[in-house]
């Protein structure tokens, strides 16, 4: 889990737009965040396996 101070810092509007970055809404992870879901890859995988993301299923070939 991310520190609360870092999550609060990410939620504030930065002085310059290029400084803004996405964080996972569930765990606060700053890297590998899917914009479509607002979640990191780890949370997307866990929630997809649990069936908590509608329209998403595990592919196999």
Swiss-Prot record:
Cofactor: Zn(2+)
Residues engaged in binding Zn(2+): 24, 27, 40, 43
InterPro entries: Ribosomal_uS14, Ribosomal_uS14_bact, Ribosomal_uS14_CS, Ribosomal_uS14_sf
HAMAP family: Ribosomal_uS14_2_B
Protein task: Binds 16S rRNA, required for the assembly of 30S particles and may also be responsible for determining the conformation of the 16S rRNA at the A site.
Pfam families per UniProt: Ribosomal_S14 (PF00253)
Record-stated family: Belongs to the universal ribosomal protein uS14 family. Zinc-binding uS14 subfamily.
Key word Metal-binding present: yes
Free-text comment on the cofactor: Binds 1 zinc ion per subunit.
Keywords recorded for this protein, A-Z: Metal-binding, Ribonucleoprotein, Ribosomal protein, RNA-binding, rRNA-binding, Zinc
Subunit composition and interactions: Part of the 30S ribosomal subunit. Contacts proteins S3 and S10.
GO cellular component: cytoplasm; small ribosomal subunit
Natural source organism: Rhodococcus opacus (strain B4)
GO MF term list: rRNA binding; structural constituent of ribosome; zinc ion binding
Record bears the keyword Ribosomal protein: yes
GO biological process, one term: translation
The protein, known as: Small ribosomal subunit protein uS14
